[in-house]
């Protein structure tokens, strides 16, 4: 009975490969028989799907078989995943949650993404003690590491890179912006731009949008309206927008379209003309070119988190052993234990 993870991140895989991985791993949530096929009876999983990584954390009573089956299936789809089991799985999630494995060293958004993935999995499926322990300890250690060590206040962020791009295309504070969707990244970019004097911001979302932004209902949305820059950060696909097409996007001269979605909102067969289209990989490359992080700082962070992971792994092994003994004597035990 072992915990494991298979997945890919921005380090190993381009956007197209991450899209395929996300679409495949999403199928586990839609079809629980698929999960049982790979993980076996009693198997459980939590997907962690973000713009920059697609991972499946799993529990299986036949870990070697489960890992081999998952790797084989992903490889057959042109995906080259990494994999970790046991202590290595703990160490990996601890480093991911702390932000030291992120595109921007120490960024805080990943902590929330890990927490939401865990809560979603807990709400939708019965999870074993093992996955609860792994995620709760990763969130705890990640938070403690941030408060104890602290990270540098980065000058380079996705938001600042977006502003640089806008300036390079001669977009001013009088530019009209449309944000489609109320995702984390859309909110962060909008807040950053507003703080820097870009006040002509409109949101179109099914969620409630807070001030100071203007809002637009889906019924009145038209991509032929004079928005100079459009940001897509919605969970909805392009087919769900009746007026969305290459022609409607190109209807406004010199328009810029940022596509933050993964999988992307658009899968162009050819590079579109009539407007500038920038996806999340383009933004990520711009961020990486501007970032400077010392190797010494990264190695120190990895060492500290590896030690924390080893400590929690040893605790997990003891608790897991006790649970196994209790299962032998009593078939009914709580699915979530306090520790």
Swiss-Prot record:
GO terms for molecular function: glutamyl-tRNA reductase activity; NADP binding. The record marks 92 as: Important for activity. Signal peptide: none annotated. Its EC number is 1.2.1.70. HAMAP family: Glu_tRNA_reductase. It catalyses: (S)-4-amino-5-oxopentanoate + tRNA(Glu) + NADP(+) = L-glutamyl-tRNA(Glu) + NADPH + H(+). During catalysis, the active site Cys acts as a nucleophile attacking the alpha-carbonyl group of tRNA-bound glutamate with the formation of a thioester intermediate between enzyme and glutamate, and the concomitant release of tRNA(Glu). The thioester intermediate is finally reduced by direct hydride transfer from NADPH, to form the product GSA. Pathway: Porphyrin-containing compound metabolism; protoporphyrin-IX biosynthesis; 5-aminolevulinate from L-glutamyl-tRNA(Glu): step 1/2. The active site is at residue 51. NADP(+) binds at residues 181-186. Disulfide bonds: none annotated. It comes from the Bacteria. Catalyzes the NADPH-dependent reduction of glutamyl-tRNA(Glu) to glutamate 1-semialdehyde (GSA). Keywords: NADP, Oxidoreductase, Porphyrin biosynthesis. This is Glutamyl-tRNA reductase. PROSITE patterns: GLUTR.
